[in-house]
């Protein structure tokens, strides 16, 4: 019985951890979008006027088309997005 309880707690902890990470990704992308002042660079690309935000901004823009997928409960997609988020940092 103790083993089952321990396994259940591990599963709950992992699920909560994934949800928190998704919330972090969502918050970072939303904050970036709101605080970024977009400008068009000489080469025609759109960049963020705030240098610290530029890397995250690029990440968020690349995620924009599938951000809703990142919020779904498909652990493969979540894991992929979380890894991309950590690499973009």
Curated annotation (Swiss-Prot):
Which compartments does it reside in?
Secreted
User: Which residues are in coiled coils?
Assistant: none
The Gene Ontology terms for molecular function here are: toxin activity
Give a brief account of the tissues where this protein occurs: Expressed by the venom duct.
Q: Mind listing the UniProt keywords for this protein, alphabetically?
A: Cleavage on pair of basic residues, Disulfide bond, Secreted, Signal, Toxin
Signal peptide as annotated in the record? 1-22
Report what the Swiss-Prot or TrEMBL entry states about this protein's PTMs: Contains 4 disulfide bonds.
Q: What's an example GO cellular component term for this entry?
A: extracellular region
The similarity annotation says: Belongs to the teretoxin C (TC) superfamily.
Entry comment, domain topic: The cysteine framework is XXII (C-C-C-C-C-C-C-C).
What is the protein's given name?
Teretoxin Tan22.12
State the species of origin.
Terebra anilis
């Amino acid at each position: 019985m103790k083993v089952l309880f321990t396994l259940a707690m591990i599963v709950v902890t992992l699920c909560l951890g994934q949800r928190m990470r998704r919330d972090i990704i969502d918050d970072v992308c939303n904050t970036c979008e709101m605080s970024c002042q977009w400008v068009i660079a000489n080469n025609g690309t759109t960049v963020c006027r705030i240098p610290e935000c530029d890397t995250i901004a690029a990440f968020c823009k690349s995620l924009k088309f599938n951000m809703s997928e990142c919020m779904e409960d498909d652990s493969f997609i979540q894991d992929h997005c979380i890894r991309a988020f950590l690499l973009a940092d």
